[in-house]
């Protein structure tokens, strides 16, 4: 049973989201390794988030969304200008980039397993910014959430992460 189906039926979703945020924070506390063992070929390399990866993700906008509204010539013109601006922005990004990032941490990849939460579909994971997965959870396109609920989830995450950082900085 996915948390998507659970959340669809719930009126008060905050308690469930808190449980999912708690698991996310546990995952984020794990020191990521760039190479992990797997059963198929021995090891798998988890890459770091990079400008190249960010460009691949923004390309989705040009490849999938804009063709619904514009011709190829206009898309190429917009893409060229936008890529130039984005390249500058990506160079100036300065955020913590040393966390395990699932990259698909949303309700359909979170399973109810007894009283625990199971996480599936992690083959696209990277080492990157911890907020990526939080945004995937809060802004899940499959579920409508109010601004109020999004803020409550975000505030809960901040409160919990601030406690973690305070504890870690005192060690």
Question: Where are the regions a protein language model picked out?
Answer:
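Flexible, glycine- and charge-enriched loops at secondary-structure boundaries
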Residues: 10-17, 75, 79, 143, ...
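ATP-binding pocket architecture of kinase catalytic cores
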Residues: 1-56, 94
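An alpha-helical support segment within catalytic cores of ATP-dependent transferases
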Residues: 32-35, 44-45, 52-53, 57-100, ...
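Charged catalytic carboxylate motif
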Residues: 19, 23, 81, 85, ...
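Active-site acidic catalytic loop and adjacent metal/ATP-binding pocket
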Residues: 27-28, 86-134, 141-145
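Active-site activation/catalytic loop segments of kinase-like enzymes and analogous catalytic loops
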Residues: 59-69, 130-166
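Hydrophobic, secondary-structure "cap" segments at the distal end of domains
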Residues: 170-171
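Glycan-recognition and catalytic cores of secretory/periplasmic carbohydrate-active enzymes
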Residues: 32-44, 51-55, 102, 107, ...
């Amino acid at each position: 049973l996915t948390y998507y189906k659970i959340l669809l039926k719930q009126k008060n979703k905050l308690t469930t989201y808190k449980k999912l945020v708690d698991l996310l924070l546990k995952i984020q506390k794990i020191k990521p390794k760039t190479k992990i063992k797997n059963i198929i070929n021995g090891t798998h390399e988890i890459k770091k988030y990079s400008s190249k990866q960010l460009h691949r993700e923004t390309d989705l906008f040009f490849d999938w969304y804009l063709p619904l509204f514009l011709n190829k010539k206009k898309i190429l013109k917009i893409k060229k200008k936008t890529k130039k601006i984005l390249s500058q922005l990506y160079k100036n990004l300065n955020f913590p980039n040393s966390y395990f990032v699932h990259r698909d941490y949303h309700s359909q990849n979170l399973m109810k397993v007894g009283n625990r939460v199971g996480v599936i579909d992690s083959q696209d994971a990277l080492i990157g910014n911890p907020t990526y997965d939080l945004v995937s959870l809060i802004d899940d396109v499959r579920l409508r959430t109010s601004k109020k609920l999004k803020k409550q989830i975000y505030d809960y995450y901040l409160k919990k992460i601030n406690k973690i950082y305070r504890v870690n900085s005192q060690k």
